[in-house]
Amino acid sequence: MCNGEKPKRLRYNQPEEMTMKNHAIRMLLGAILVAMTSASSFATETIKAVVIDGYPARALWVKEFTNFFIPEIDKRLAMSGNYKMDWQESYGGTIVKPKGVLEGIKLGLGDIGIVTTIFHSSKLPSQAIAAATPFVADDARAVAKAVDEIAKEFPTMQAEFEKQNQVYLATGVVLDTYQLFSRNPVNALVDIEGSKVAGAGMNLRYLEGIKGAAGVRGGLTDFYNMVQTGLVDHAMLWPEAAKTFKIAEVAPYMLRANIGAVNSKTITVNKGYWERLPDEVKKALQEVALAYRDHVAGIAMDRAKASRDAYIAAGGTIVDMDPAERTAWANAMPNIAAEWAKKLDDAGQPGTPMLNAYMAKLRNAGFEPVRDWAAENAAN
């Protein structure tokens, strides 16, 4: 500089500098993007589910929906962490009465429901298959499995629910076998003649061969008052329900006729709600519905003896029906199974094949019917 030279400026390689800066920015943005993607991939989607039934929470099938079905769904979904259910349970008439579940699910008042099918014989005729074949099997597990297999092998059952804007998941058999509970001692068919019997759906037809006996339609929650007030002399239900609803207080005599186990519940889902569900949730619902079916049927059988013991402890008396009287009762009825099958046949549905398949399934499971409804139907 003393020589008059101008100071030299330091020159930077600008392209290289910019390249390094851009690379750093890209690295930073990439890290942020990865972090955001990672966070979103672990975000759990919450799905609201409104469950309805008109029966109270203490009813076996409702109680086990809370204690078994819901925790099982939660457990399966937690394995992936993709989805979580926000359960909203509404029972005991909060949204619908016992007879209103089918309509409630159809209209979207609930997303998932436990439909009592015996109240809807005109809309769900194929669901009466077990009720139309009394005195065949008194094992809830065998009947539940057979009915569900029929629903899978024949499209009729699922199609009936589809017409009601809902998807069929699984059947439910919540009783070991129907028995007759009475205000006064009953030992034989003659003791039922000329009396009134509370029942629901198809089982009222069991009385048609008994002279002067009349069925009075009612729901399980109505039976106590119906007997107490003298509206009826007897009620057809099962020991576990008799224990739950304290039937021994008004009907202290049980005739053990072993009329048979009947499918009376079906778990369904509103069709629109179902279509919006992710496949993972659909799969969980389908699998747990079958597990719930077997779980509830198993409890019904496990509790059968304990429920009879509880009935006796509450002041009840149990009388075993003479086998000859039981056979006479079965033979006195019209062939309601054949009538059921013909009605479906006439509507273009496979009523007779369904009846034959159902009876064959129960025979293969080790049950010999008191009356072979399918064989009589074939003979005619």
Annotated model-derived regions:
Residues 18-29:
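Bacterial N-terminal signal peptides that target proteins for export
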